[in-house]
């Protein structure tokens, strides 16, 4: 009979569901319980014919574990319109519990193959056949035999079923035994599986559906979520029952109907009746079903009788349960349904009747025929139900479930979910440093809120345990509501101080506005939009006295007055905020727990509460015996071992009996090295047992009893047990390993785990970590209360004697911040969306349950295909592959670890000569599962494949490798640990042996069913999840257009859930079956390879590839100069445009970006779609789709997943793309970012000189700093270990100074904040740092910090990242000439003789050969690596670097290598020995100051790009080709065009006379004209654009289209620019042409010679000098002539023009003529003979001077001329004095200056200064022996006297200092002379 529903009286809202534990179930057992009878009547197949359970369970136990729904009467109210104000009952609707009976936990046991043949119904080989198993008694007996001898409890019956297994589902259904589990003590799937493995040969060793909860199965069957509405069948009237502490109702599951929008009238579908008849008939006709003639006859007769009445069956509303019941009953009849033993007699009788109807006599009817009929009826029933499920999902729901229904269902779920009650809490304890006193909970603050319906808290309560030092009377004055609330409000309101001040300061500096109200308008607009602060309506009005702020501080104070609150803390004393004081801790905890239980919570939130707050509260409850809780005692087993890990807490968060199940942190993956170690140990142990049997007793005497049995942590634990007995348990130490706690009724959500690792606010200079303080500032702009009274060390004092108000406020603010972060991250709404899609309650989403969650998603698809859920407890003994005695077996392939996706090796390098395009497969792994139908369900067993046609499946050959370990010791060697002539003791056998391994290729042919046979579960899941995601993203966009913010948030959470769920499918397949996982990755690799093959043909070889992506270079569109290119094609963009647009001078950026994009889009289309008209098929099956992801125009590829690039965006913008760098990982520091990001930017942009200088400066500063830090930490550690706890700060500071520490780099820049794991057994650097901190400050390990400050050494911070980049530069082999030069420099730097260098060369050559040989061996990488034919050639395609740069990089590597080795040796001696020599930079104070300023500036302010600049930013020469040509300089203002323009102000400045210094720019709207002009002076109201920075920083970008600044004028002092670094002021236009910016672009290397610069060929100069004077001429005069293309050289005989090229400050060529009028008559006199000496006599340049340039640079202010001569050697300086002109002539063979050509220079500098005669110059040879290394830029200058003085100086005294380690003395040499090594 159909269910009649009363929508008003029977509507219930449910928010959670669970299966209670047996104690909770036992509480609801009642003698008069009448539900048992109903269950008994409907489950007769579970009980024997006598009415008693054949497994021994009583009838009451039959139904004592119901599903428990938490419900409330009626529906939830609509979401509030005002989210900032709560109205209603804080506890929400009255709740009770609905006990739903009739469903049981079930497992499926798969029968062996001999039971699957229906033709063997008479077979009794195993005492049973498949017909026998239709009988309850036979099934029960067989299961009992399988469970014999095992402690298996709680199974109450069985049932024979016909279902598909999870693996090889496409092979068809199998007979299984369904085992029903119930009772107080139930068997786990793990126990059953172990039992089957040990005892049974009738069942496969699998337990299906073990991870599917009963309520998940129920919800999936009903298509209902874990949150929603339900109704109870009218007339049932269960009635609300009163329990001791809660109300409840009892119902049967069949009496419940969900509001799931899954009830339809099937007749609305055209032809549905005929479809159903055909569906039922097709089951009989399927050739794989193989039904007998009797079954076919009977079913066809039933279908004929069904046809006339089917219209009535489908004409009324049906949900699936009703529909299935009607169809099965009409087709099968009641007697045949389920084929239970009760009906077997009638079934047999009916079979015989049918045979008679077919004309077969009774005596001819064989028993085998009848049995086969009975078994086939069972098969048909299950196949019918499966077909009806598929029909319902695909035909009915797919057509009748509308978008309106879907939206209503989603909105209903979110309406309920957003109103669920959540409570956040935080505790304080009475911790005292260096004290063993028992810690107590002193304060608890609770904030009640909901999951998104309101922005504000609902209610707050503070529970305070009064200290004994205070009286209850004194609390009236010591603790007041108003003061606490005011302190909380003040902290929240003042939290934005830092952000406000930073923004205001920058805005004021740029605008100069204090007296304008516009700055406040700008400020309030920004803060309201970015931070959603509430502001008074009159915020923009000034005070009554009309006084305006006149400074940043006044402006800040004014703004703060206008801010109401950042968020509403909603603390109204007596209304929604209450403080409760208690005399005892126990009273306080009881009140707190009562409040929690009364609040009807769904979620309990906290910050690190799972690992601290909750365990601490539970520990105190156990100590105080609250609620009968007892202290935990570790279980001791019969073998003497102890259970060290606690499994559950007896804490109730509701009024029902409950437990908190502990989920510990999972261990990481086991490395191959561990497998190898385990296997070899096992192998050696077995050998020892055989070889040393007689020596066991002797060996045992020598062994320690714990050796080899326990790891270090277990040994420590065992030692504690010996000392203190078996009850030793350290609850808070164990709590640190807890991942989460899971209750049956309330979820525990740790907000700290919800916070992403990469927090926002990249400009914040305070270290980022996941502490509450950092996270709150990152997401809210607010910090914790920072006051001395509430510091960690003083909290207890404040609680006892101090200001209680700030004590309470401190805890309250922490709780409020946690709540607000939780709301900001939308974690509650995400949980509601996730729970609804995975059919699990919210509480199960935080229990480290990714496996269960994904299996639940898959089960929702497996259910309607009649497939069981898989057994996830897969054990793969990978150790055995590494055993030296292992022999390969083909069946072992399934246990090999699948190989990963596509990788690429040997392509590291700098790719500046080509742009590259990164293609990416869209959701490749889900796409492979869909397109190739790869899934565990479609993977066919051999038996199933043999039954199919070859057209029904595809074969896939999957490659892999397995290891072959072999003994590597020389046979008979005395060093061999297996040489019995040497080894005499058992324990020594094999210990010192060497082992090596090789890999052997293997493959496996897997067969996957095609979609025509069955669509894979994984593919169907992914397809639907991705389709839903696309749908939700569309709805989100529509909601955004309509301004519905609530729907935007909801749909965003839903689409994120779909994405996460789809991505998790592959991980589950990889776990369940290695063959399936390997097939997916193999096909993905092949797709990548096929795409790369084509892209290589049309574009070029691959520079990158990673899993689902590949990146070819544009080999046919090189960016560097090629033979045949026009000489005017200067710069990569000019060349690229010339190749793309032949004949055009300068196309727009958008044009050639569009052309490149179109070109490569066509390549992708060819692969994705093929060319149908030409018969060219696509390269893969849809939905596989290769798309352009990124286009790079500069790339540095360091290694896999580790690169830096400049990315071209579709609109013509340029952005930075960074992947995998160390500066982005958890141990990131500012220094790492300054090392990698800055240097990689320099490489990509071609600033090679800056790279060398900056890298040298940075490393020199950091190696000194970090060495001193490490030495000081070592000294403190020794002191602490020896019991010295006083004076440690002074010791640390003194040690740092002794080791050269100079406060050059702020500590915050090289300190990381890292997670602390195991402090008692420290493994990571963070663990060790925190352990030392705890010992130093007397902090108990149990309450150690979760994150700590870590200062790592020079290698991880700078050395390793820098070396990796350096090696990338050197990846390309040098030319023969470069090899010769580099070899000579190596000899000089390393002080090697020719013979020593030859040996070193041979060593390196041998090393390369070994690497080459090793690479030729078989290895796992061979499976995944991109074929060599598709890779770039590093020696052809990487950027070649000039000799000068290569030498600089090699010298830097030598410097790093020396430093790291020296510091390592010092570290090994605890820094008693001093072996490290300070870098040369430390000896030159002027250079040190310069380097420090520049490096600190780079660390503080460097940004790769603060916004997306136009692409031509990458190449200024592209701008220069489109300079605004100014012909009439008399006009004051000049208008810029509104197009893609980029104005280089230097190039405008060079066209003027030299004296005008200023360029002015007028700010205007983009729609108007932008103007600029040149002036001799500036007005007071103008704002100076001043830049002394090296690279573009955020402060350098000024907008020129700000409507609030219209009419303002910026100006630049160009003479100031002239003295700065290689800077270029530019005005750039954004790609969308809507904005203009004034920016500054520069380099790191300083060069003051900006104005007067030219280059002359050496040979040209030699000829000119010989023609312009006598040999005896003392001077030659060089004059640039205005408007001419050369330099006039004047001698005594004649004068003439010498052809030259004028250059800019950065080495780039200027227009051919000299531009500076006023410098026309100023000549520079150069001593002729000295110049000739430089050109002819220098050994280093004698052979190259005729082929290279001299470069002359003039400094207009100091009138200095520098002549640079190219050479390839390091720096030497020679000084001498010219008496006639009183000039100092300085000849530098070194690094003074830059050039495009690259290489070392010889520089001559003439300075017009009078100085004393310098001392005698040190001869060249002797000077070179002063050090092994000479600096790249400014080496110290040593005279002969300097050396003598150095030789005669007595040795510096070694200072003995007390290290703090018990008076032990160590030597530290003070004041090492700087500059003696680098």
UniProtKB/Swiss-Prot annotation:
Coiled coil segments of this chain: none
Stretches with biased composition (Acidic residues): 694-709
Catalytic reaction annotation: DNA(n) + a 2'-deoxyribonucleoside 5'-triphosphate = DNA(n+1) + diphosphate
Claim: Nucleotidyltransferase is one of the keywords in the record: yes
Region (Disordered): 691-727, 1839-1878
Any Gene Ontology biological process: viral DNA genome replication
GO molecular function, one term: DNA-directed DNA polymerase activity
Domain of life: Viruses
SUPFAM superfamilies: DNA/RNA polymerases, Ribonuclease H-like
Compositionally biased intervals (Basic and acidic residues): 710-723
The keyword Metal-binding appears for this protein: no
InterPro entries referenced in this protein's UniProt entry, alphabetically: DNA-dir_DNA_pol_B (IPR006172), DNA-dir_DNA_pol_B_exonuc (IPR006133), DNA-dir_DNA_pol_B_multi_dom (IPR006134), DNA/RNA_pol_sf (IPR043502), DNA_pol_palm_dom_sf (IPR023211), DNA_pol_type-B (IPR050240), RNaseH-like_sf (IPR012337), RNaseH_sf (IPR036397)
A UniProt-annotated Pfam family: DNA_pol_B
Keywords linked to the UniProt accession: DNA replication, DNA-binding, DNA-directed DNA polymerase, Nucleotidyltransferase, Transferase, Viral DNA replication
Biased composition (Low complexity): 1868-1878
Enzyme Commission no: 2.7.7.7
SMART domains documented for this protein: POLBc
Alphabetized PANTHER family for the sequence: DNA POLYMERASE CATALYTIC SUBUNIT (PTHR10322), DNA POLYMERASE DELTA CATALYTIC SUBUNIT (PTHR10322:SF23)
Family: Belongs to the DNA polymerase type-B family.
Protein name: DNA polymerase
């Amino acid at each position: 009979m159909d269910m009649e529903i009363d929508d008003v009286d029977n509507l219930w809202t449910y928010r959670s569901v669970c299966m209670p534990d047996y104690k909770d179930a036992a509480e609801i057992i009642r003698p008069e319980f009448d539900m048992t009878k109903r269950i008994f009547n409907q489950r007769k197949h579970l009980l024997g014919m006598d009415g008693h359970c054949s497994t021994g369970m009583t009838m009451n136990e039959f139904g004592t574990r119901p599903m428990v729904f938490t419900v409330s009467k009626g529906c939830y109210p609509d979401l509030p319109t005002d989210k900032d104000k709560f109205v209603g009952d804080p506890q929400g609707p009255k709740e009770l519990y609905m006990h739903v009976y009739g469903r049981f936990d079930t497992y499926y046991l798969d029968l062996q193959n001999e039971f699957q043949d229906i033709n063997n119904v008479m077979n009794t080989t195993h005492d049973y056949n498949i017909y026998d198993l239709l009988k309850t008694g036979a099934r029960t007996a067989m299961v009992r035999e399988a469970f014999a001898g095992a402690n298996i409890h709680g199974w109450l019956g069985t049932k024979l079923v016909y279902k598909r297994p999870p693996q090889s589902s496409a092979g068809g259904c199998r007979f299984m035994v369904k085992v029903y589990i119930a009772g107080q003590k139930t068997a786990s799937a793990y126990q059953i599986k172990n039992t089957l493995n040990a005892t049974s040969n009738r069942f496969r060793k699998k337990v299906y559906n073990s991870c599917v909860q009963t309520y998940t199965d129920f919800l999936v069957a009903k298509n209902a979520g874990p949150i929603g509405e339900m109704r109870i069948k009218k007339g049932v009237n269960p009635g609300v029952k009163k329990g001791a502490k809660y109300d409840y109702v009892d119902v049967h599951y069949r009496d419940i109907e969900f509001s799931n929008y899954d009830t339809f009238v099937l007749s609305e579908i055209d032809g549905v009746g005929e479809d159903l008849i055909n569906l039922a008939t097709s089951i009989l006709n399927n050739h794989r079903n193989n039904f007998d003639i009797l079954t076919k006859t009977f079913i066809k007769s039933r279908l004929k009788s069904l046809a006339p009445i089917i219209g009535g069956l489908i004409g009324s509303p049906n949900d699936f349960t009703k529909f299935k019941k009607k169809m099965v009953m009409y087709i099968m009849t009641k007697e045949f349904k389920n084929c239970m033993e009760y009906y077997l007699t009638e079934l047999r009788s009916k079979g015989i009747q049918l045979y008679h109807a077919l004309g077969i006599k009774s005596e001819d009817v064989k028993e085998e025929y009848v049995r086969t009929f009975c078994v086939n009826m069972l098969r048909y029933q299950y196949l019918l139900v499966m077909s009806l499920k598929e029909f319902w999902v695909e035909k009915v729901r797919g057509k009748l479930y509308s978008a309106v229904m879907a939206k209503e269902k989603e909105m209903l779920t979110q309406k309920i979910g957003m109103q669920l009650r959540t409570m956040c809490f935080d505790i304080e304890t009475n911790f005292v440093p260096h004290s063993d006193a028992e810690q107590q909970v002193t304060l608890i603050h609770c904030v009640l809120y909901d999951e998104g319906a309101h922005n504000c808290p609902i209610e707050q309560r503070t529970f305070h345990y009064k200290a004994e030092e205070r009286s209850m009377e004194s609390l009236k004055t010591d603790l007041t509501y108003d003061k606490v609330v005011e302190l909380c409000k003040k902290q929240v309101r003042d939290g934005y101080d830092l952000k406000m001040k930073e923004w205001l300061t920058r805005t004021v500096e740029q605008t100069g506005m204090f007296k304008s109200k516009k700055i406040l308008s700008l400020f309030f607009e920004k803060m309201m939009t970015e931070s959603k602060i509430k502001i008074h309506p009159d915020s923009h009005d000034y005070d009554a006295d009309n006084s305006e702020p006149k400074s940043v501080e006044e402006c800040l104070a004014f703004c703060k007055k206008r801010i109401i609150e950042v968020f509403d803390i909603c603390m109204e004393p007596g209304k929604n905020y209450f403080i409760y004081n208690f005399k005892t801790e126990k009273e306080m905890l009881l009140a707190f727990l009562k409040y929690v239980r009364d609040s009807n919570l769904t979620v309990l939130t906290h910050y690190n509460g799972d690992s601290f707050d909750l365990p601490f509260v539970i520990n105190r409850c156990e100590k105080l015996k609250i609620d009968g809780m007892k202290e935990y005692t570790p279980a001791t087993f019969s073998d003497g071992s102890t259970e060290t890990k606690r499994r559950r807490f007896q804490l109730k968060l509701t009024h029902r009996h409950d437990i908190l199940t502990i989920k510990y942190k999972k261990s990481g993956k086991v490395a191959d090295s561990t497998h190898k170690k385990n296997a070899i140990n096992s192998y050696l142990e077995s050998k020892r047992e055989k070889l040393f049997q007689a020596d066991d007793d002797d060996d045992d005497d020598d062994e320690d009893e714990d050796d080899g049995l326990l790891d270090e942590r277990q040994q420590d634990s065992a030692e504690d047990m010996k000392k203190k007995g078996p009850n030793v348990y350290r609850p808070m130490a164990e709590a640190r390993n807890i991942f989460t706690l899971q209750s049956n009724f309330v979820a525990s959500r740790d907000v700290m785990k919800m916070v992403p690792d990469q927090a926002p606010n990249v400009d914040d200079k305070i270290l980022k970590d996941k502490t509450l303080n950092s996270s709150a500032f990152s997401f809210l702009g607010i910090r914790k209360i920072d006051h001395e009274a509430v510091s960690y060390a003083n909290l207890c004092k404040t609680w006892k004697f101090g200001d209680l108000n700030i004590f309470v406020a401190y805890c309250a603010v922490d709780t409020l911040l946690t709540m607000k972060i939780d709301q900001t991250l939308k974690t509650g709404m995400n949980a509601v969306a996730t729970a609804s899609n995975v059919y699990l309650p919210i509480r199960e989403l935080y229990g480290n349950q990714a496996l269960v969650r994904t299996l639940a998603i898959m089960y929702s698809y497996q259910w309607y295909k009649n497939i069981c859920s898989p057994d996830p407890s897969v054990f793969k003994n990978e150790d055995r592959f590494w055993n030296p005695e292992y022999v390969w077996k083909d069946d072992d392939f399934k246990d090999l670890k699948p190989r990963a996706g596509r990788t690429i090796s040997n392509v590291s390098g700098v790719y500046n000569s080509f742009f590259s395009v990164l293609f990416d497969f869209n959701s490749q792994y889900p796409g492979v599962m869909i397109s190739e139908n790869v899934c565990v369900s479609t993977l066919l067993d051999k038996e199933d494949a043999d039954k199919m046609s070859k057209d029904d499946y595809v074969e896939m050959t999957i490659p892999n490798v397995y290891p072959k370990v072999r003994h590597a010791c020389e046979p008979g060697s005395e060093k061999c640990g297996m040489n019995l002539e040497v080894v005499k003791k058992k324990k020594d056998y094999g210990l010192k042996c060497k082992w090596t391994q090789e890999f052997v290729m293997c493959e496996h042919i897997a067969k996957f069913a095609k979609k025509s046979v069955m669509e894979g579960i994984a593919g169907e899941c992914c397809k639907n999840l991705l389709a839903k995601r696309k749908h939700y993203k569309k709805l989100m966009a529509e909601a955004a257009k309509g301004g519905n913010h609530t729907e935007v948030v909801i749909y965003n959470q839903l689409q994120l859930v779909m994405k996460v769920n789809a991505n998790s499918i592959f991980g589950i397949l990889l776990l369940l079956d290695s063959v399936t996982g390997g097939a997916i990755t193999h096909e993905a690799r092949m797709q990548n390879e096929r795409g790369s093959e084509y892209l290589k043909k049309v574009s070029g070889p691959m520079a990158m590839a990673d899993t689902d992506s590949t990146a070819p270079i544009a080999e046919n569109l090189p960016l560097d100069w090629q033979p045949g290119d026009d000489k005017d094609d200067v710069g990569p963009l000019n060349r690229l445009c010339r190749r793309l647009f032949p004949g055009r001078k300068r196309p727009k950026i958008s044009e050639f970006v569009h052309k490149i994009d179109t070109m490569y889009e066509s390549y992708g289309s060819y692969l994705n779609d093929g060319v149908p008209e030409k018969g060219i098929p696509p390269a893969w099956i849809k939905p596989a789709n290769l798309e352009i992801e990124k286009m790079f125009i500069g790339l540095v590829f360091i290694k896999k997943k580790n690169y830096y690039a400049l990315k071209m965006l579709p609109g013509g913008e340029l952005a930075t793309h960074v992947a995998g760098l160390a500066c982005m990982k958890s141990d990131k520091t500012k220094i790492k970012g300054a090392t990698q990001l800055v240097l990689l930017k320099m490489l990509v942009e071609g600033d090679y000189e800056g790279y060398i200088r900056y890298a040298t400066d940075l490393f020199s500063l950091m190696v000194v700093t970090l060495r001193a830090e490490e030495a000081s930490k070592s000294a403190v550690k020794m002191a602490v270990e020896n019991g010295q706890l006083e004076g440690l700060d002074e010791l640390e500071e003194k040690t740092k100074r002794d080791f050269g520490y100079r406060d050059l780099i702020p500590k915050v820049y090289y300190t990381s904040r890292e997670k602390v794991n195991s402090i008692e057994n420290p493994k990571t650097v963070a663990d060790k740092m925190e352990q030392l901190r705890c010992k130093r400050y007397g902090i108990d390990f149990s309450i150690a910090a979760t994150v700590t400050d870590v200062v790592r050494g020079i290698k991880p911070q700078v050395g390793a990242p820098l070396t990796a980049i350096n090696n990338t530069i050197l990846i390309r082999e040098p030319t023969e000439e470069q090899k010769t030069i580099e070899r000579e420099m190596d000899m000089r730097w390393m002080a090697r003789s020719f013979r020593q260098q030859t040996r070193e060369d041979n060593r390196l050559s041998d090393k390369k050969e070994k690497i080459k040989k090793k690479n030729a061996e078989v290895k796992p990488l061979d499976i995944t690596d991109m074929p060599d034919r598709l890779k770039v050639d590093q020696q052809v395609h990487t950027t070649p670097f000039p000799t000068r740069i290569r030498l600089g990089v090699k010298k830097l590597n030598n410097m790093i290598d020396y430093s790291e080795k020296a510091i390592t040796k010092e570290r090994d001696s605890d820094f008693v020995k001093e072996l490290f020599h300070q870098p040369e930079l430390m000896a030159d104070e002027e250079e040190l100051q310069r380097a420090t300023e520049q490096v600190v500036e780079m660390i503080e302010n460097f940004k790769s790009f603060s916004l997306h600049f136009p692409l031509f930013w990458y190449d200024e020469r592209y701008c220069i080709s489109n300079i605004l040509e100014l012909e009439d300089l008399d006009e004051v203002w000049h208008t810029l065009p509104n197009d893609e323009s980029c104005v280089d102000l230097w190039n405008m400045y060079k066209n003027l006379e030299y004296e005008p210094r200023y360029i002015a720019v007028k700010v205007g709207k983009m729609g108007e004209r932008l103007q600029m002009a040149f002036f001799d002076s500036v007005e007071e109201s103008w704002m100076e654009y001043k830049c002394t920075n090296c690279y573009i920083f955020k402060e350098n970008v000024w907008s020129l289209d700000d409507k609030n600044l219209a009419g303002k004028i910026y100006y630049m002092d160009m003479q100031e620019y002239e003295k700065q670094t290689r800077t270029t002021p530019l005005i750039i236009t954004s790609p969308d042409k809507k904005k203009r910016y004034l920016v500054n672009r520069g380099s790191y290397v300083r060069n003051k010679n900006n104005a007067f610069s030219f280059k002359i060929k050496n040979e040209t100069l030699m000829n000119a000098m010989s023609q312009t004077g006598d040999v005896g001429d003392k001077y030659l005069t060089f004059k640039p002539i205005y408007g001419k293309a050369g330099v006039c050289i004047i001698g005594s005989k004649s004068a003439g023009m010498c052809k030259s090229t004028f250059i800019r400050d950065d080495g780039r060529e200027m227009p051919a003529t000299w531009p500076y009028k006023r410098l026309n008559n100023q000549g520079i006199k150069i001593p002729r003979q000295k110049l000739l000496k430089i050109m002819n006599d220098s050994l280093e340049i004698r052979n190259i001077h005729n082929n290279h340039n001299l470069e002359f640079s003039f400094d207009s202010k100091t009138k200095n001329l520098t002549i640079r001569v190219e050479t390839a050697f390091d720096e030497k300086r020679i000084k001498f004095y010219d008496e006639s002109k009183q000039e100092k002539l300085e000849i530098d063979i070194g690094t003074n200056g830059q050039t495009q050509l690259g290489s070392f220079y010889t520089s001559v500098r003439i300075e017009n200064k009078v100085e004393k005669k310098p001392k005698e110059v040190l001869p060249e040879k002797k000077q070179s022996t002063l050090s092994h290394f000479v600096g790249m830029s400014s080496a110290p200058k040593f005279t002969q006297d300097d050396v003598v003085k150095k030789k005669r100086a007595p040795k510096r005294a070694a200072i003995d200092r007390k290290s703090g380690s018990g008076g032990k003395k160590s030597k530290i040499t003070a004041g090492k002379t700087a500059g003696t090594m680098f």
